[in-house]
Swiss-Prot record:
Known cofactor(s): Mg(2+)
Gene: ndk
Annotated ATP binding sites: 11, 59, 87, 93, 104, 114
Subcellular localization, as worded in the UniProt entry: Cytoplasm
Xref: SUPFAM superfamilies: Nucleoside diphosphate kinase, NDK (SSF54919)
Location (main, coarse): cytoplasm
Species this protein is from: Paraburkholderia xenovorans (strain LB400)
Reactions the enzyme catalyzes: a 2'-deoxyribonucleoside 5'-diphosphate + ATP = a 2'-deoxyribonucleoside 5'-triphosphate + ADP; a ribonucleoside 5'-diphosphate + ATP = a ribonucleoside 5'-triphosphate + ADP
GO biological process: CTP biosynthetic process; GTP biosynthetic process; UTP biosynthetic process
The name this protein goes by in its record: Nucleoside diphosphate kinase
Keyword Transferase: yes
Length: 141
């Protein structure tokens, strides 16, 4: 099995619900290590840059508005097959379709306020981690 890193964001809705610790526990119980972490209130410019891949999509403005509506907690996770493992923990994008026991099924309210973001591939994980954490601030353990 490959040791990978993935980026995870606990979005403003989940931060406001004070479930950060519960989400971290799920990461750690699944064998993922938190190798970098920080809380940040994204600027509009940073949110637009981070989600630039979606700029032409009809939901882009609403996504950016939501992501700047409150602080987020950003973490780099490391472990065997971290990307797939993290995506399994998150559940389907639409919490109504997410399996019971997933983060989105348990903590998300809607397809827009869906509690968490996760990288979808090794290439995007590398870009997303670098966006929030200069390499010197990520610590394998």
């Amino acid at each position: 099995m490959a040791i990978e890193r993935t980026l995870s964001i606990i979005k403003p809705d989940a931060v406001a619900k004070n479930v950060i610790g519960q989400i971290y526990t799920r990461f750690e119980n699944a064998g993922l290590k938190i190798v970098a972490s920080r809380m940040v209130h994204l600027s509009r410019a940073d949110a637009e840059k981070f989600y630039a891949v979606h700029a032409a999509r009809p939901f882009f403005k609403d996504l950016v508005d939501f992501m700047i509506s409150g602080p987020v907690v950003v973490q780099a996770l490391e472990g065997e097959n971290a990307i797939l493992k993290h995506r399994d923990l998150m559940g389907a994008t639409d919490p109504k379709k997410a399996e019971k026991g997933t983060i989105r099924a348990d903590f998300a309210d809607s397809i827009d306020a869906n509690a968490v973001h996760g990288s979808d591939a090794p290439e995007t994980a590398a870009v997303e981690i670098a966006f929030f954490f200069p390499q010197v601030n990520v610590y394998s353990r």
